Amino acid sequence: MDGNQPAYLFDFLGVDISRCIKDEIINGWILLSRKITLYLDPQTGQVLKTWQNPWSGETLNVMHRSYDYQEFEIPQQIKAHIAPEISSVSLDINLKLPNPLAKNPKFSEHSPEEFIQSSDSYKFIFPTKMLSDETLTPADNRAVALSYYRMGPWEPWMKMKGKPGFLVLNYTGTKTDAFEELHPEIKAQIQQRMPLFYEAPTHRLQRSIATSWSRFDEQFDGYLRGEEFPLPAPVAEEV
């Protein structure tokens, strides 16, 4: 950014609670999910409540990511590398979309850019036998590993005031079907404040997909008040 060296800003901790459903209308599969991502202090590993912007010096409320509904239409054809023992499938998503916050003056210091441009790359790595073994159990999901790499714009809560630059995120993870195997911080959030996130959505909803920008718009007043994020998510009927 502005000729500066890359800066190590955060570590991350997260969970993606998801399920696939068959959609007869498109004759394909839809991935439905809820997602939590917590920002961690890279030195201590503690969940951040506030963050000091190293360029502006401002201390800001941290808006951890919580998306209660997302959906993704799984392509009919997916890039795959099939090997005798270990195989992988890859998904690459490149987007350039209008920024819904850009024209609102109250967000001018948070997200003034005209477009949101990002590149996301997912890779799932698994034993090749999972493609043909009909005796697999849910416990076998633990053998699936995930790699996720993203280049995208600053998060609105970082209040970068339109300065040039971007975030590079690099995640690794594993698949599990057991709630008890989640990180204690994630479990505590779900048990104490976000019971809606115990399960993935069961069907497609008639609503827009959550993003950092839509959430910032919806929760901006709470952000200014210094409320604790992610905000509570009680169980609710979804239509």
Task: For the regions a language model picked out, list residue spans one by one.
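N-terminal segment immediately downstream of the Sec signal-peptide cleavage site
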Residues: 1-43, 173-177, 184, 188, ...
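Intrinsically disordered, low-complexity, compositionally biased regions/tails
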Residues: 49, 61, 166-169, 177, ...
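Extended soluble regions of mature proteins
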Residues: 116-174, 180-185
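Long intrinsically disordered, low-complexity regulatory regions enriched in proline and serine/threonine
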Residues: 180, 191-199
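Intrinsically disordered, low-complexity regulatory segments enriched
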Residues: 56, 60, 159-162, 218
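Predominantly extracellular/secreted and cell-surface proteins with exposed
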Residues: 3-141
